[in-house]
From Swiss-Prot:
It catalyses: (S)-ureidoglycolate = urea + glyoxylate. Belongs to the ureidoglycolate lyase family. It comes from the Bacteria. InterPro entries: RmlC_Cupin_sf (IPR011051), UAH_cupin (IPR047233), Ureidogly_lyase (IPR007247), Ureidoglycolate_lyase_dom_sf (IPR024060). Gene3D superfamilies: Ureidoglycolate hydrolase. Its cofactor is Ni(2+). Keywords: Lyase, Purine metabolism. SUPFAM superfamilies: RmlC-like cupins. Its EC number is 4.3.2.3. Pfam families: Ureidogly_lyase. The lineage of its organism: Bacteria, Pseudomonadati, Pseudomonadota, Alphaproteobacteria, Hyphomicrobiales. This is Putative ureidoglycolate lyase. GO terms for molecular function: ureidoglycolate hydrolase activity; ureidoglycolate lyase activity. Catalyzes the catabolism of the allantoin degradation intermediate (S)-ureidoglycolate, generating urea and glyoxylate. Involved in the utilization of allantoin as nitrogen source.
């Protein structure tokens, strides 16, 4: 099993995959323009409240997902750090497992995955975490596509302090 080491989530490190806004530094209005990126096919805005469960034990990633028509934004509602895992798509459209990166988002960070970015489901590090999620959908399905990994990936979070 391959192991990747999580590092703190920063806007600079995450820029190839989307955007990060930190509400702990909020002095004025924060614009989340990237939260509404989508294709012309995705015409229905979606806002969902999500109760996400933590993984038991050391995090092991066995699948990734992609939203081909829309960006996807998660706003934390609890004081829970979360694990963010992303990778590039290979030429065959499957996850390129050699490009997997892991980040630790603080409870004050809003994360937006750019449309077409492979990522793992949002995973809080506390027993559970509540999030508001927004994206666009087509209304005909195919808005979330799941891809299994050939080899599960373990994520080392031991060097990260939330």
């Amino acid at each position: 099993m391959k192991t990747v080491t999580a590092r703190p989530l920063t806007a600079e490190a995450f820029a190839p995959y989307g955007s990060v806004a930190d509400i702990s530094e909020l002095e004025n209005l924060v614009s989340l323009a990237d939260a509404y990126e989508g294709t012309g096919e995705a015409k229905t805005p979606v806002l969902q409240l999500v109760q996400a469960k933590a993984m038991s034990g050391s995090p092991v990633i066995s699948q990734m997902e992609i939203h081909p028509f829309s960006s996807q934004t998660f706003l934390p509602l609890d004081q829970s750090s979360s694990l963010i895992v992303v990778c590039e798509a290979g030429e065959d459209g499957m996850p390129d497992e050699s490009t997997i990166k892991a980040f630790l988002a603080s409870p004050s960070q809003i994360v937006t995955y750019r449309h077409g970015v492979m990522h793992h489901r949002l995973t809080p590090l506390a027993p559970s975490g509540r999030f508001a999620m927004t994206m666009w959908q087509t209304g005909r399905g195919g808005d979330t596509v799941l891809y299994p990994l050939h080899t599960p990936v373990s994520v080392d979070i031991s060097d990260i302090t939330p």
